[in-house]
């Protein structure tokens, strides 16, 4: 069974889904030096924006096949280094659509009710 490291907090439902097909270890807040030490034993890495996956981490990843980003961007992953090593980098670009829509509506309501002006007074 493949091993997946979840290095940033994700919802328990995501961990439950991963656990159906892999052995999942949740170790959040690992410093880069520690991640370099533990990454060789994992086939997959699940991150959010907190974990920076640099060239050193990718080079240490002897079994890694995939890096999954729970969120929109992959700017915290050295994608060229991962690609050279044959590691697939994926993200979930539609993961924040509801939150973004809610925020946009809240901002529109705030402007229509003059909340910023009231806050300044």
Predicted regions and their residues:
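Phosphate-binding beta-alpha-beta segment of Rossmann-like dinucleotide-binding domains, i.e.
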Residues: 85, 93-121
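An N-terminal-biased, well-structured beta-alpha scaffold segment characteristic
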Residues: 1-92
